């Protein structure tokens, strides 16, 4: 946050919008999840073997040795040990609940046993929880449906610690949401200097496990600078390079000796082959020679990606950042290919985008440092680069958006409808480590989007339907 304008006190986030079946990064599409399996549906050629016919269909298994075609295993003990009578493996012992489903723990050589009389119904497979779907995601297993978001209780992780993911973004990989954000545990005195970027994981948007500090001051020597600021990290997946790519705002705490100013006004890029692994520093720079501060990412279903940020003059001087710029990224997502100015002289920051049908919506806040203000949105019937209408529509969220600032819009794509969740930061300017969060469902009346406060509200993650609001 804390974008600085000449018009505002120098006291002081971005959106990845994905939503596809696979990585669904809330920024619009794209990612293909890690891991892999072929066509799933149950066993994917599990240890039930490829030739043994005794297994009938091995329905229960998701790769268990009663799997696809009998429990004899891939070679099943010559070619017939999984044979017609299912002699390939003592009651499907080739892997009771084959994990992952790609080859089944029954093994490739019919480890289910030599002349076991089992087979027949693939009893070893029991109720295996995960084969692999065609997109590489596990299938089956327990699914949480109705969940309640509590805006009044503590936002803690599974260890009881306060969630440190400020200015964050979200990406969904298979059945898991990942929440990236600024770790401000050590920012107890109101300064926003960089310490780490956190990654949390959840299957229900309520129970969050801290997976990793994916970027730290030890990631690269260039990050070990007490004046460094990194804000609003967002992550999308590049299906071509098979890398998760993170963009964020890069800056320095002081300019020409003036504490509290942004002087670099740049973007920074990191990559990782796994969503929650250690990310590698790539570069920091001014996109197309333009200054860049608060930012987010957007990804189209065809994989085209955009970096959106508060733009201003190039160079290393603190200046007025009144414009909003959309930077189309290169095919590897590591550099900028072209730049379009979409909201000129509107002095906005803290962007979050979502798309419904053929319309794009972009919510943002005014630039008032750490102090909250009323969030408002614009509409584009063209592309993320516009044309946008020129009149901001308030979300009706009182004059401070209940003391929050936008950071992301999370789409919950269900079997009946898609619900869009406004995710905001509630900043504590005196002790940033105590900053917290506000999540509310966006509602549409056919003409206008609205945000209404609820201390608690519930949603069915399978159908996408709000069950209470």
Where are these regions (language model features)?
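Terminal low-complexity, poorly structured segments
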Residues: 6-9, 22, 116, 145, ...
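Ser/Thr-rich, Pro/Gly/Ala-heavy low-complexity intrinsically disordered linkers and tails
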Residues: 13-139
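Arginine residue identity/basic-tract feature
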Residues: 2, 28, 55, 61-62, ...
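Carbohydrate-active catalytic/glycan-binding domains of CAZyme proteins
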Residues: 136-469
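Sec-dependent bacterial lipoprotein signal peptides
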Residues: 1-17
């Amino acid at each position: 946050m804390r974008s600085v304008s000449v018009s505002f006190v120098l006291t002081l986030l971005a959106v990845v919008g994905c939503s596809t079946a696979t990585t669904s990064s809330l920024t619009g599409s794209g990612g293909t999840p890690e891991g892999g399996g072929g066509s799933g549906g149950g066993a994917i050629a599990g240890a039930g073997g490829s030739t043994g016919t005794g297994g009938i269909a091995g329905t229960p298994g998701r790769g268990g040795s009663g799997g696809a075609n009998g429990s004899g295993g891939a070679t099943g003990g010559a070619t017939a040990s999984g044979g017609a009578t299912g002699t390939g493996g003592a009651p499907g012992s080739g892997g009771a609940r084959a994990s992952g489903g790609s080859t089944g723990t029954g093994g490739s050589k019919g480890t289910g046993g030599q002349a076991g009389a089992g087979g027949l119904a693939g009893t070893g497979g029991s109720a295996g929880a995960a084969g692999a779907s065609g997109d590489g995601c596990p299938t089956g297993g327990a699914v949480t449906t109705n969940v309640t978001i509590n805006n009044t209780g503590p936002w803690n992780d599974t260890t009881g610690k306060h969630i440190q993911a400020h200015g964050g973004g979200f990406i969904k990989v298979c059945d898991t949401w990942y929440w990236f954000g600024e770790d401000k545990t050590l920012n107890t005195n109101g300064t926003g200097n960089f310490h780490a970027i956190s990654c949390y994981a959840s299957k229900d948007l309520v129970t969050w496990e801290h997976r990793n500090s994916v970027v730290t001051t030890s990631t690269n020597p260039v990050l070990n600078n007490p004046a460094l600021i990194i804000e609003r990290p967002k992550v999308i997946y590049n299906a071509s390079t098979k890398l998760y790519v993170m963009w964020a705002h890069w800056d320095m705490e002081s300019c020409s000796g003036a504490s509290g100013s942004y002087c670099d006004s740049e973007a920074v890029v990191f990559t990782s082959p796994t969503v929650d692994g250690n990310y590698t520093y790539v570069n920091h720079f001014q996109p197309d020679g333009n200054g860049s501060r608060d930012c987010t990412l957007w990804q189209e279903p065809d994989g085209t990606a955009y970096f959106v940020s508060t733009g201003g003059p190039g160079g290393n001087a603190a200046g007025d950042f009144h414009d909003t710029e959309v930077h189309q990224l290169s095919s590897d997502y590591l550099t900028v290919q072209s730049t379009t100015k979409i909201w000129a002289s509107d002095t906005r920051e803290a962007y979050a985008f979502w798309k419904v049908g053929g319309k794009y919506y972009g919510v943002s806040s005014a630039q008032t440092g750490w102090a909250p203000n009323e969030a408002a949105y614009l509409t584009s019937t063209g592309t993320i680069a516009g044309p946008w209408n020129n009149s901001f529509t308030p979300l009706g969220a009182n004059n401070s958006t209940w003391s929050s600032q936008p950071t992301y819009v999370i789409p919950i794509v269900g079997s009946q409808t898609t619900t869009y969740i406004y995710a905001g930061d509630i900043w504590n300017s005196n002790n940033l480590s105590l900053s917290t969060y506000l999540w509310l469902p966006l509602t549409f009346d056919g003409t206008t989007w609205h945000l209404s406060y609820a201390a608690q509200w519930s949603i069915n993650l399978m159908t996408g339907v709000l069950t209470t609001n």
